[in-house]
């Protein structure tokens, strides 16, 4: 699942159509059933957190927060900050010339006091951070940590963070759609001197949300439609025997859709990349998306030129509803492509957020 300040820019389809395990830190009751040409899917929200050895060593780091406002003049920024429902004390602090700066390009930067960051109201935080999210220079706001609202309580309950820190997380979280976003982990890390709590915060910050997805296979029913949907790209012969065996049992059966994915996705789903010293390959969302149907990953997709060539020669844009294996692009408000993913079914995608070893492959 992709969450960003953007929207789906386009869907393209391959013209072939005619890792160490992460730690599952929490789950929530299955609340979502989705039916369609893919069959009947049951979704269980889960969170994956990397093991401590792949986390950045941030226990002794003092983090700085600076907001950048490209496109703003002094007067327009003053007007904006005066219009986001700040308290008099917050407004005075953020408008203090001592916390303002300009870079060589004239972009205004503001260094907010951490007390101001922690005290923002949900309304002010959402409006202010939506503005910051318009620029990649504000990376934590442009691509914030996010979690579905129905998973937040379970995640914090299993986090082993103190009640005080849990309350701070709730205070700095802001809503966008059905997700909570958090951009202020650096402020939270600075607020505690407990090394153990810092490590737990780092694990939480690097946790990724996803779904465990089960397909209900009706007993004695026809599997032709399921084979047609999940068996694209010449995979019907692999999919049919498995589904056929499931439907011959007594009573409806459920199967993890991992078994229906190509080998690349099947062997990586809900795992973290292996760390290899000296390996500079950028195996990110684009590399993962373009290798979805490959048995042996093609590292030319880790380079922009290789990715562009593959899309230009082997994909076509489609305007209708996406189907299994279609490639989806997500853009920022400036039109810049910030993410890609592979459509599976029921508005679910297979993806990897970033190339880092702390980011798993998820649905």
Predicted regions and their residues:
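...with weaker cross-activation on analogous glycine-rich loops/strands in unrelated enzymes
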Residues: 299-358
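Sec/Tat signal peptide C-region and signal peptidase I cleavage site
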Residues: 26-30
């Amino acid at each position: 699942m992709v969450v960003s300040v953007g929207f789906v820019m386009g869907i393209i389809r391959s013209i072939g159509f005619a890792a160490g395990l992460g730690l599952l830190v929490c789950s929530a009751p299955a609340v979502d059933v989705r039916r369609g040409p893919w069959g009947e899917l049951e979704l269980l929200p889960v969170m994956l957190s990397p093991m401590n050895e792949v986390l950045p060593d941030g226990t002794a780091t003092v983090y700085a927060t600076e907001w950048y406002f490209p496109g703003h003049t002094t007067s327009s920024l003053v007007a904006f900050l005066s219009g986001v429902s700040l308290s008099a004390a917050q407004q005075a602090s953020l408008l203090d010339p001592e916390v303002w700066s300009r870079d060589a390009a004239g972009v205004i930067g503001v260094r907010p006091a951490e007390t101001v960051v922690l005290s923002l109201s949900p309304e002010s935080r959402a409006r202010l951070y939506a503005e910051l999210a318009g620029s990649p220079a504000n990376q934590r706001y442009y691509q914030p940590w996010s979690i579905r609202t129905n998973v937040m309580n379970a995640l914090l309950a299993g986090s082993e963070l103190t009640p005080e820190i849990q309350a701070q997380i709730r205070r700095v979280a802001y809503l966008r759609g059905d997700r909570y976003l958090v951009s202020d982990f650096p402020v939270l890390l600075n607020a505690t001197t407990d090394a153990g709590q810092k490590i737990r915060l780092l694990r939480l910050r690097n946790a990724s949300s996803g779904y465990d997805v089960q397909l209900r296979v009706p007993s004695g029913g026809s599997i032709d439609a399921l084979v047609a949907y999940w068996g694209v790209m010449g995979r019907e012969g692999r999919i049919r025997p498995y589904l056929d065996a499931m439907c011959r049992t007594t009573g409806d059966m459920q199967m993890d859709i991992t078994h229906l994915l190509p080998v690349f996705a099947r062997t990586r789903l809900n795992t973290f990349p292996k760390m290899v010293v000296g390996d500079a390959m950028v195996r990110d969302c684009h590399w993962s998306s373009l290798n979805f149907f490959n048995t042996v990953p093609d590292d030319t997709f880790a380079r922009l030129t290789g990715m562009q060539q593959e899309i230009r020669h082997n994909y076509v844009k489609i305007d209708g509803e996406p189907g299994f294996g279609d490639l989806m692009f997500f853009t920022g408000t400036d039109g810049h492509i910030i993410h890609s993913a592979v459509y599976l079914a029921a508005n679910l995608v297979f993806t990897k957020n970033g190339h880092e070893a702390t980011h798993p492959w998820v649905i």
